[in-house]
Amino acid sequence: MNKLFTFIMLWMMSCLPTLAQAPMDGGVWKDNTGKHINAHGGNIFNYKGTYYWYGESRSQDGKPYSSLGVSCFTSKDLKKWTNHGLVLPVSNEPGSDIEGGCIIERPKVLYNQ
């Protein structure tokens, strides 16, 4: 009986990878404009059937650590992403916590009623 139970459990666990579906099979993830998704250190969460991806938007001018701010992308299926631009751009105000040239590490978004 114990051997049968072990066999059934192992067989069931071997079926799990076939049930899981990857949102994408690799390659470059692009948004609705055809550009590479620029959301470094971000997180994805689901709210009312829409996935939201917030992350640091980094400069594309050859300066790998120059932050532009926090960008937002949305998707219904984790495959097709819509770019909503910068939702929190860096500030031109000297001394600001998000002053131009800063690095924004792992931005988070909290729901506020």
Locations of the language-model features?
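Positively charged n-region of N-terminal signal peptides that target proteins for export
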Residues: M1-L4
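Bacterial N-terminal signal peptides
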Residues: T6-C15
